[in-house]
Curated annotation (Swiss-Prot):
Catalytic reaction equation(s): (6R)-5,10-methylene-5,6,7,8-tetrahydrofolate + glycine + H2O = (6S)-5,6,7,8-tetrahydrofolate + L-serine
Gene: glyA
Single GO cellular component term: cytosol
Binding site for (6S)-5,6,7,8-tetrahydrofolate: L118, G122, H123, L124, E242, S350, P351, F352
Sequence intervals crossing the membrane: none
Entries under Pfam families matching the protein: SHMT
Chain's role: Catalyzes the reversible interconversion of serine and glycine with tetrahydrofolate (THF) serving as the one-carbon carrier. This reaction serves as the major source of one-carbon groups required for the biosynthesis of purines, thymidylate, methionine, and other important biomolecules. Also exhibits THF-independent aldolase activity toward beta-hydroxyamino acids, producing glycine and aldehydes, via a retro-aldol mechanism.
Protein name: Serine hydroxymethyltransferase
GO BP annotations, alphabetical order: glycine biosynthetic process from serine; tetrahydrofolate interconversion
SUPFAM superfamilies the record matches: PLP-dependent transferases
UniProt-annotated site: Plays an important role in substrate specificity, residues: H225
Compartments where found: Cytoplasm
Cofactor entry: pyridoxal 5'-phosphate
Organism: Helicobacter acinonychis (strain Sheeba)
Amino acid sequence: MAYFLEQSDSEIFELIFEEFKRQNEHLEMIASENYTFASVMEAMGSILTNKYAEGYPNKRYYGGCEVVDKVESLAIERAKKLFNCQFANVQAHSGSQANNAVYHALLKPYDKILGMDLSCGGHLTHGAKVSLTGKHYQSFSYGVGLDGYIDYGETLKIAQSVKPQIIVCGFSAYPREIDFKKFREIADEVGALLLGDIAHVAGLVVASEHAHPFPHCHVVSSTTHKTLRGPRGGLILTNDEEIAAKIDKAIFPGTQGGPLMHAIAAKAVGFKENLKPEFKTYAKLVKSNMQVLAKVLKEKNHKLVSDGTSNHLLLMDFLNKPYSGKDADIALGNAGITVNKNTIPGETRSPFVTSGIRIGSAALSARGMGTKEFEIIGNKISDILNDINNVSLQLHVKEELKAMASQFPVYHQPIF
């Protein structure tokens, strides 16, 4: 495949190869990123990209769908088995599309959404004013207490005051486990539906390394990449037949047209990988590696939001530091460690600067790095932050980590 690309567009070929080198030589520690399975990439690059298939299996608007019907049906059945649920829609192009489809299916314009505050770890689609959800619906938020944990008592009070039609439990930057049972109790108290957004922790959920959203959530949304290591895409799950029918209509024709059949095939491939025993071993490694990293950083007197982590990510707190999340992001990037600046609870700086960084363990765990490597990485992160303007140190660390990274190739052959 790469041969044809090199011949037809050498510029793009070279840029992809450049990115291939970057991913191999740098330590990818952005919590939402991961290395997908090589088999998933093969499916993504297949001839299925040529086929339009508006509708659903055996209910298409186009002819010639007999093969892609089998592909999508397989993806649906594997998703249902993986998440132990009765209904699955695999057509959502992304996690944001999945969430918007849920709202479109279950809410009316200007209904009320209660989701986690963006600065406390929520996602744009959980009701942020700048997003579609914040414009088409009335959005309200809950947050975390001084300890960095979700304050369920305060969340109940907010829900009783707001009386939302839907409550969203999920996050993009919360280092602790979600208590779905408590959220369902809150939802029942105010007569709301409960949406569990497990985009970040889906891989941990299916490996029994995080609480399961069912039977507590009425509907569950997720991405298929991140901790699942599948292709970029979205997924919606439920055990309610009526909700499932509404979701299907909300995806097509409500918010999308033709599904991406190559992506759906890749999702099916990813789900099969997730069902293997080896994936449980991987998920355990993701958590144990993050525990080691948190331990090292705390021993080096670095402050962490909620004083640690229970999942695949942690947040470093720079509220009382002279440097910002942006400064740390740049310094660590210079040292070959890719993280992202992130707002944190009690944020005082702009979202473009921030007072924190988010660090994840999923991608490096996929490369086979273990607790030994994460201890080294933790010490290097500490060294960089303690002397944040020392460019020569950053370059020295970059070379050290590049040598370590070379022992853990992303892919064992140049697939790109």
